[in-house]
Amino acid sequence: MQLSRWLFSTNHKDIGTLYLIFGAWAGMVGTAMSVIIRAELAQPGSLLNDDQIYNVVVTAHALVMIFFMVMPIMIGGFGNWLIPLMIGAPDMAFPRMNNMSFWLIPPSFILLLASAGVESGAGTGWTIYPPLSSNIAHAGGSVDLAIFSLHLAGASSILASINFITTIINMRTPGMSFDRLPLFVWSVFVTAFLLLLSLPVLAGAITMLLTDRNINTTFFDPAGGGDPILFQHLFWFFGHPEVYILILPGFGMISHVIAHYSGKREPFGYLGMVYAMIAIGVLGFLVWAHHMFTVGMDVDTRAYFTAATMIIAVPTGIKVFSWMATLQGSNLQWETPLLWALGFVFLFTLGGLTGIVLANSSIDVVLHDTYYVVAHFHYVLSMGAVFAIFAGFTHWFPLFCGYNLHPLWGKAHFFMMFVGVNLTFFPQHFLGLAGMPRRYSDYPDAYTLWNTVSSIGSTISLVAMLFFIFLIWEAFASQREGVTPEFANASLEWQYNSFPPSHHTFDETPSTVVIVK
């Protein structure tokens, strides 16, 4: 009975739980890989004694964190759990397709780990650029397995996106018009469109790479009239929207958390927040070549991509200042989720500022492929997306489980993590400005100090992760009853009559839900 409940589930809460548990496991795998990277770089000289293995670990770390940690947790976990509850729907529009979306992910994960484990592994970086990923530089099955892994993960995301879009358009409760949709629902709605439009391009690119490797096509081989730069354009046309896919649901969750602990019914400038997310989604498709400033583009092309990239800072700024306006003058409840949200706003903004620096093509030519870029995207991912996940998890944990996390130890975990990630990634700005390149397993002695500091920071983050596992155990062991949060009157997900809401949210489909604004 239990086996069929979890294997053949058509229930959005069960599938959301599966996604959250899977994402937690994948997150531990990805964290372990990052600790291997930082152990190698903790001091000059070699630990692994093999640059290929080092690059395999770097590649797997990136792909695991993106496709098997952030996306399953944010979109699959929080999306499945919260969106039907927030819009007053009995479940998702296509419950069985929802189940398939989840069960495509573990085989995809196994294929990725297999790609790292067979032959000499895929040491291409997560971008899989040819000719390094061609059958000459990477003979054997590793890259092919990675390609199949991405195909499965992509198929899963496309199915999930269709499901979310259909659910949000068709299954809102009466009175829940689009201009009253909770911001998290809006964020997943926009994210689903980004996935739907960008993933097929990635699928095309990696399929062409597969045929280049195995049946002698020359899409990316100049010898047959192909061009490796074509792959970069296709990949980044997916890859740039992808980074917004990773952060947009986080924006939605942070909006809920900040409004909630400010004692507000909604964030400041609700409609502006919605338009800002849509604008970020649209602009995200128009800036992909800023990842390619060093491949030799015309100066006018570079001018366009520099300008377009900087324009994205405008809607992002609207969001940041609206969050700050929500906090302004309110009686804050200093609980753990708010700490994560404030940490998010501060550190995401810092990461955004280094992004503005990198948008300048003339500067980027110097900083491209240095640790400055690594520092930039880890500030927006490791302290943006991950902090948003922790904010959302600590906020909605009572809703999901009916129990409360330990309030004091939850705060302790936040401060431990805050120190760890900042100590890890802030020094990398210095390394990048000093010219230390990415994806190398060793470095000149001059870079020793900040690498050592960075590796100490990663050890602190590792301890924080172990402490978080203990926190979850402690919550289930102590069984402190969850109570309706004080300011939950504006959020539909807290209005159901039990924590967690019953397996089937409604005994009968509700006819009306009155929403007072």
From Swiss-Prot:
The chain crosses the membrane at residues 17-37, 63-83, 102-122, 145-165, 183-203, 234-254, 268-288, 305-325, 338-358, 380-400, 414-434, 456-476. GO terms for biological process: electron transport coupled proton transport; mitochondrial electron transport, cytochrome c to oxygen. It is found in: Mitochondrion inner membrane. SUPFAM superfamilies: Cytochrome c oxidase subunit I-like (SSF81442). It is an enzyme of class 7 (translocase). Binds 2 heme A groups non-covalently per subunit. Keywords: Calcium, Copper, Electron transport, Heme, Iron, Magnesium, Membrane, Metal-binding, Mitochondrion, Mitochondrion inner membrane, Respiratory chain, Translocase, Transmembrane, Transmembrane helix, Transport. It catalyses: 4 Fe(II)-[cytochrome c] + O2 + 8 H(+)(in) = 4 Fe(III)-[cytochrome c] + 2 H2O + 4 H(+)(out). Its EC number is 7.1.1.9. There is a cross-link at H240-Y244 (1'-histidyl-3'-tyrosine (His-Tyr)). GO terms for cellular component: mitochondrial inner membrane; respiratory chain complex IV. Belongs to the heme-copper respiratory oxidase family. Component of the cytochrome c oxidase, the last enzyme in the mitochondrial electron transport chain which drives oxidative phosphorylation. The respiratory chain contains 3 multisubunit complexes succinate dehydrogenase (complex II, CII), ubiquinol-cytochrome c oxidoreductase (cytochrome b-c1 complex, complex III, CIII) and cytochrome c oxidase (complex IV, CIV), that cooperate to transfer electrons derived from NADH and succinate to molecular oxygen, creating an electrochemical gradient over the inner membrane that drives transmembrane transport and the ATP synthase. PANTHER family: CYTOCHROME C OXIDASE SUBUNIT 1. This is Cytochrome c oxidase subunit 1. It comes from Paracentrotus lividus. The gene is COI.
